[in-house]
A protein has these predicted regions:
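PLP-dependent amino-acid enzyme catalytic core
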Residues: 1-310
Length: 310
């Protein structure tokens, strides 16, 4: 099962990108094709392998980490394959689908204050570890260098190969920062002219689960903003609108962070006359059908001639 992680397909965005200059192309890497359903399979497996090699993860230990969903799902899946118990701390308001998937893999969930978001989960996870340090192995996705290394060694080379080296711009949302840091470092090494641009919510209070508004958040230790060529802020409304367009015009059902990534990519694409833009779609949208992305928002959205209604 774990050998299936990586080598995800690259999709050219066509109908949604109509009207761009003919020499501008946008591609999205569909990370939902990983066995655990998201880009987080990559760093989760890299961190677990490192824990096993170092001896920090061994029989009798429980895997513990904070998550907004996808890393937790990845760790729960990996734990089930390897036979390790998994305990996760996540905000109480994450979607029911993510809770159910994690529990289906046999992992335990401890819920943190929903008003504190992912930062609250980080703090509560640290407290649990402090109370029982010998019980747990904590991958610590926000501070573990194995997180970006997974993308440096795998995701980055895949993207460069899939575009035949023609990529000119790379965009990714900021959650832990692992994807943008790891892919960005690899691409800059092979071609320093490639632009690496981060995507983040435009406000501290937002509905883009999995993404961090860095100015108001605990900054992950693996995130180094000075390595970026820029950042593009995206509103919740614009990201949601792009999700609807993708489902109706491209046949791709994705989550909020993917909508934000494509909105930012289109924003950039309209400003250039030639280039190959690649972004990441971290997962598919089946884990978000019970959230505000679809419930309620559908009443106010029209895509093409289709009016969404509950």
């Amino acid at each position: 099962m774990l050998d299936l992680i990586g080598d995800t397909p690259l999709l050219e965005i066509q109908r949604v990108s109509e009207g761009l200059h003919s020499k501008v192309k946008i591609y999205a890497k569909l990370e939902g094709f990983n066995p655990g359903g998201s880009v987080k399979d990559r760093p989760a497996w890299q961190m677990i392998q490192d824990g096993l090699k170092s001896g920090k993860l061994r029989r009798g230990k429980t895997i513990l980490d904070s998550t907004s969903g996808n890393t937790g799902i990845a760790l729960a899946m990996i734990g089930s394959v390897l036979g390790y118990p998994v305990e996760l701390v996540m905000p109480a308001n994450v979607s029911i689908e993510r809770k159910q998937i994690i529990q289906a893999y046999g992992a335990k969930i401890t819920y943190s204050d929903p008003l504190e978001g992912s930062d609250g989960a980080i703090r509560q996870c640290r407290k649990i570890l402090e109370e029982s340090p010998d019980k747990f192995f904590k991958p610590d996705q926000y501070f573990n260098p194995m997180n970006p290394l997974a993308h440096y060694e795998n995701t980055g080379p895949e993207i460069y190969r899939q575009t035949d080296g023609k990529i000119t711009h790379f965009l990714a949302g900021i959650g832990t920062g692992g994807t943008i840091m790891g892919v960005g470092r690899y691409l800059k090494e092979v071609d320093a002219k490639i632009q690496v641009i981060a995507v983040e919510p435009d406000d501290a209070l937002h509905g883009l689960e999995g993404l961090k508004h860095m100015a108001s958040s605990i900054v992950p230790g693996i995130y180094h903003e000075e390595e970026l060529d820029g950042k593009i802020p995206v509103s919740t409304e614009d990201a949601y609108s792009m999700v609807y367009r993708l489902s109706q015009e491209e046949g791709v059902l994705v989550g909020q962070s993917s909508g934000a990534a494509l909105f930012a990519a289109l924003n950039l694409a309209r400003k250039i006359r030639s280039g190959t833009i690649v972004t990441i779609f971290p997962d598919f949208g089946d884990k978000y059908l019970s959230t505000n992305l679809w419930v309620g928002w559908r009443d106010r959205m029209t895509v093409g001639n289709i009016k969404f209604s509950i």
